[in-house]
Amino acid sequence: MQRPSGSREVRKAVSAVSASKKEQATRVKKHVVRRQKGTMAAAPKSHVHVKKLTVEEGVRTGKNSVHQLQAQVDTATQQESSQGPVLLSQLPETTSVPYTPETMGQQLTVSLSGEPYGPSAMPSMCPSLILQPCATTDPMLLQPQGSSASNQASVSATLEWQEMLEAAEALLALKNSSQTRHQPCGMPGTAGERGLQLPNPSMPPRPASSGSLPSGHLDCMSLLT
């Protein structure tokens, strides 16, 4: 006699669970419809497809939870048929339908062309824009720097050459002054001393090859070596 009473109680519990599921589904639908009416005035027409997708997701999640509750009730009835009557306190607890309202930013991530939505589309585009190198159009920055280095080297070489010539001329002047003290002014020197003549002071020193240098410069170079 306890079996029919237990089955009736299980049926009543199942009917109560199904009624609560229906109420929750209607509440979810009403809430989604109200949200749609409120956002239709502000959002453009291009986002209608996005809103439809969000509504379909909410309905699918509700259906999945209903199927899970139905499976729990079926397992409870199978246990009752195999073990005897089941008390109402041991029935599976009714779970509410999970509903997570989505923000406008999450809705915008859905692609309008019908492709699967997700946040993976935007990050694939951003790195290509951020990592592009900036092109410089200044011609002065693009010129090679080899010419400046060669110019500096030539300038330093000419300065060293002029310093060497000045030092050699100073040595020759000292040598000639010491020789003129021992010799009269009108007496010409020997053939070796004639080569030790001072260069013209009006002419500036200039770098040249050994073949084109005058005898005074050659003597300067021999003194330096």
From Swiss-Prot:
* UniProt entry tagged with the keyword Transcription: yes
Q: Which UniProt keywords apply?
A: Transcription, Transcription regulation
Q: Which InterPro entries match?
A: DMRT-C1/C2_C
Biased composition range(s): Basic residues: 27-37
Q: Which residues form the signal peptide?
A: none
Reading the lineage from the top rank, the first entry is: Eukaryota
Region annotated Disordered sits at: 1-49, 179-216
Ranges of Basic and acidic residues compositional bias?
Answer: 1-12
Q: Give yes or no: UniProt keyword Transcription regulation.
A: yes
One Pfam annotation reads DMRT-like
Q: Which residues cross the membrane?
A: none
What GO terms fall under cellular component here?
Answer: nucleus
For this chain, the family text in UniProt reads:
Belongs to the DMRT family.
Name of this chain's protein: Doublesex- and mab-3-related transcription factor C1
Q: Which organism is it from?
A: Rattus norvegicus (Rat)
Gene behind this chain?
Answer: Dmrtc1
